[in-house]
């Protein structure tokens, strides 16, 4: 007959701590894998009009780049993508397709886990 030993409090705390650590690492991995990207297109000067959303859609579609949305904003367009790779590809395509006079920039999402990690890394920590 086999007698089962009851786990000690120390073993239980190690098990709980390890489970929490694995859960946090899994959450971080998922968050990094699902990184959205936003591309902003703005005219350089006052005399240049905002690019047409349909023409932007046409250039992206012709190059096989999928996007989530195109939104007009005050002085430009915001285009959302599922990944940073799609955003970088769109920046390259639109840089060639649009006439000179536009600033095309990838924006970092302030709520993304990588943005939070970079803030923690770059912020000075004072201990003691």
UniProtKB/Swiss-Prot annotation:
GO terms for molecular function: protein kinase binding. Disulfide bonds: none annotated. The chain crosses the membrane at residues 12-32. GO terms for cellular component: plasma membrane. It is a single-pass membrane protein. Keywords: Cell inner membrane, Cell membrane, Membrane, Transmembrane, Transmembrane helix. Its main location: membrane. It is found in: Cell inner membrane. It holds the Pfam family SecD-TM1. It comes from the Bacteria. Modulates the activity of the EnvZ/OmpR two-component regulatory system, probably by directly modulating EnvZ enzymatic activity and increasing stability of phosphorylated OmpR. Interacts with EnvZ. This is Modulator protein MzrA. It comes from Klebsiella pneumoniae subsp. pneumoniae (strain ATCC 700721 / MGH 78578).
């Amino acid at each position: 007959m086999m007698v089962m030993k009851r786990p000690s409090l120390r073993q239980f705390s190690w098990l709980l701590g390890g489970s929490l650590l694995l859960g946090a690492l899994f959450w971080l991995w998922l968050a990094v894998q699902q990184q959205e990207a936003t591309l902003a297109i703005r005219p350089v000067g006052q005399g240049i009009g905002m690019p047409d959303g349909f023409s932007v859609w046409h250039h992206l579609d012709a190059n096989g780049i999928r996007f989530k949305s195109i939104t007009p904003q005050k002085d430009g367009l915001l285009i959302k993508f599922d990944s940073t790779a799609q955003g970088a590809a769109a920046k390259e395509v639109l840089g060639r397709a649009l006439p000179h006079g536009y600033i095309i920039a990838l924006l970092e999402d302030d709520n993304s886990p990588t943005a939070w990690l970079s803030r923690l890394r770059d912020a000075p920590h004072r201990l003691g």
